[in-house]
């Protein structure tokens, strides 16, 4: 069966460094008629369960550990009986939200997760957070970028555990090597393409740490 992509948007609050920001989050589902993975369970697990539509959930994949990308993960995992995956370098962020609940497995750079007969490849892209990851689906010509890359430039790096230089390096070395036509499904806002963002070099080298509460950046 051919893989297809599902999309849910939920709204809530991103909290870090003593500040709160209202945000809308993209939740992505990749699978076929029988099985699926969920990318970034944010804010409310109920619409995600509806989008799963009874399929077997192979995993709840967290692109990074900021609260607005994981705060529905535990409830979703319990509801659909699925494991939660997160890169270990974001464990300290996870522990803020879930001090008494561990993740079930680790996202590792270069690892593959099979769903619907196709492989999803994990790309470790630190910078927005130490354990930030993107998820590449070569067969569909797309990548799920979490908060690493947005329509218009890189993710915010003005918060704890983030680095603009590291983020730009990750984008250049891990994402801009993908084909230009690769579709980028982001953690917030509209999708884009690798080619479009690669041409926007000024946005990657201006050294400005964008605030996640601003219209052109997200948590």
PLM region descriptions:
Residues 2-55, 134-146:
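Conserved beta-strand hairpin/beta-sheet module of binuclear metal-dependent hydrolase folds
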Residues 43, 67, 90, 127, ...:
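Short, glycine/acidic-enriched loop or turn micro-motifs at the edges of active sites
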Residues 36, 119, 130-219:
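Metallo-beta-lactamase
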Residues 26-28, 105, 110-111, 133, ...:
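Residue-level detector of beta-strand structural context in well-folded domains
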Residues 30, 40, 64, 76, ...:
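Divalent metal-coordination and catalytic microenvironments
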Residues 22-23, 36, 43-119, 199-207:
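Active-site HxH/HxHxD metal-binding segment of metal-dependent hydrolases
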Residues 39, 58-66, 84-88, 124-127, ...:
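Active-site neighborhood of phospho(di)ester-bond hydrolases with catalytic His/Asp-centered motifs
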Residues 7-29, 95-98, 102, 153, ...:
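Active-site-proximal loop/helix segment associated with metal-binding centers of metalloenzymes
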